[in-house]
């Protein structure tokens, strides 16, 4: 009987221990690993929605929306706008809102100090649909950017396809032709003497000199 009672006591103790362990709550940290906070999920959802909205917008709509965004500083506006200029069609911007193309180009000219050199390639590829006052303002912007950083602009032009390269050189040559061409060439030659230009970059400078002599 004693042996039987001992066996029963051991069995009961084991059962009680199993029940106790099963009822013990899991540490909070374990739940935190498997479930993300609702606030984080909401933040990710909002960011995803914003990214989706930008993805669905055309280049023209994006540039216009950044230009109209009063919450951005001029520097931030310019950087966002120039990020999306490549391949833009200025006529489409006017279809969205009349006269905005000229307003935007003139704004970029006024804020040209904020245009980073790495965005020059995007600007070169933003010549579709330019005419009249638009073309004049665009040329003025390109000419000033070339004067500010000849190395970056020459490199960007050298890496362009023929159509965009020709258009870019033409705009710069037209803008610089308002000054004395001989003086402009002299300045460029002095700069060039201290550079190690590639063959393509030298071709850009030669083409620019030709354009200075015949800007129209």
Question: PLM ranges: what are they?
Answer:
Residues 2-11:
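Bacterial N-terminal signal peptides that target proteins for export
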Residues 7, 36, 40-43:
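Intrinsically disordered, low-complexity segments
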Residues 19-22:
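C-terminal motif of bacterial Sec signal peptides marking the signal peptidase cleavage site
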Residues 24-26:
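Bacterial signal peptide processing site
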Residues 34-35, 39, 48-50:
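Intrinsically disordered, low-complexity segments enriched in small/polar and acidic residues
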Residues 43-216:
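Non-catalytic all-alpha helical scaffold/repeat segments
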């Amino acid at each position: 009987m004693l042996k039987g009672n001992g066996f029963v006591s051991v069995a009961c103790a084991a059962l009680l221990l199993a029940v106790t362990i099963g009822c013990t709550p899991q540490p909070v940290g374990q739940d935190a690993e498997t479930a993300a906070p609702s606030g984080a999920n909401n933040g990710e959802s909002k960011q995803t929605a914003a990214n989706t909205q930008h993805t669905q917008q055309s280049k023209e709509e994006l540039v216009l929306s950044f230009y109209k965004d009063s919450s951005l500083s001029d520097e931030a506006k310019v950087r966002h706008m120039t990020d999306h200029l490549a391949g833009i069609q200025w006529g489409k911007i006017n279809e969205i809102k009349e006269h905005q193309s000229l307003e935007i180009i003139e704004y970029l000219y006024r804020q040209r100090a904020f245009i980073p050199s790495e965005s020059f390639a995007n600007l070169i590829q933003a010549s579709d649909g330019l005419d009249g006052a638009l073309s004049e303002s665009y040329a003025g912007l390109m000419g000033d950017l070339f004067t500010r950083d000849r190395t970056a602009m020459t490199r960007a032009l050298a890496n362009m396809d023929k159509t965009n390269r020709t258009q870019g050189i033409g705009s710069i040559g037209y803008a610089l032709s308002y000054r004395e061409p001989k003086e402009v060439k002299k300045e460029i030659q002095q700069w060039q003497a201290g550079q190690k230009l590639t063959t393509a970059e030298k071709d850009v400078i030669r083409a620019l000199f030709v354009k200075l002599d015949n800007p129209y």
